[in-house]
Amino acid sequence: MAKPTRKRRVKKNIESGIAHIHATFNNTIVMITDVHGNAVAWSSAGALGFKGSRKSTPFAAQMASEAAAKSAQEHGLKTVEVTVKGPGSGRESAIRALAAAGLEVTAIRDVTPVPHNGARPPKRRRV
């Protein structure tokens, strides 16, 4: 039987893009897109091998940002706008890691959704 042919990754030449940082209480996901919203690179704390409560640490967010930035730079990315969503602990360290990886951060936007008193929140935890 013939081997199924895999699609080859096409190297995109993009100068500027948008880095979407989704920081939840349990994980941090970093996705880098072009200005139209097409994904260029992504990474998350869980994808890097962090398990359980270690995924929610600032260090895990930093490593996820560095991994996403590295693979985005292979596509020619130089400048990036940052949008941050969520209340997680990895927000600040993820932005710093993007800048430290060699990407020029031009803008930082907080796009955390705030309800106008929508759904009822879950009950308080009793530990």
Curated annotation (Swiss-Prot):
Cleaved signal peptide residues: none
GO molecular function: rRNA binding; structural constituent of ribosome
GO biological process: translation
UniProt cross-references to InterPro entries, sorted A to Z: Ribosomal_uS11, Ribosomal_uS11_bac-type, Ribosomal_uS11_CS, Ribosomal_uS11_sf
Subunit structure: Part of the 30S ribosomal subunit. Interacts with proteins S7 and S18. Binds to IF-3.
Pfam families assigned: Ribosomal_S11
NCBIfam families per record: PRK05309.1, uS11_bact
Protein name, entry field: Small ribosomal subunit protein uS11
Family membership noted in the UniProt record: Belongs to the universal ribosomal protein uS11 family.
Record's keyword terms, sorted: Ribonucleoprotein, Ribosomal protein, RNA-binding, rRNA-binding
GO cellular component: ribonucleoprotein complex; ribosome
Described function: Located on the platform of the 30S subunit, it bridges several disparate RNA helices of the 16S rRNA. Forms part of the Shine-Dalgarno cleft in the 70S ribosome.
Organism of provenance: Streptococcus thermophilus (strain ATCC BAA-250 / LMG 18311)
PANTHER family, A to Z: 40S RIBOSOMAL PROTEIN S14/30S RIBOSOMAL PROTEIN S11
Stored Gene3D superfamilies: Ribosomal protein S11
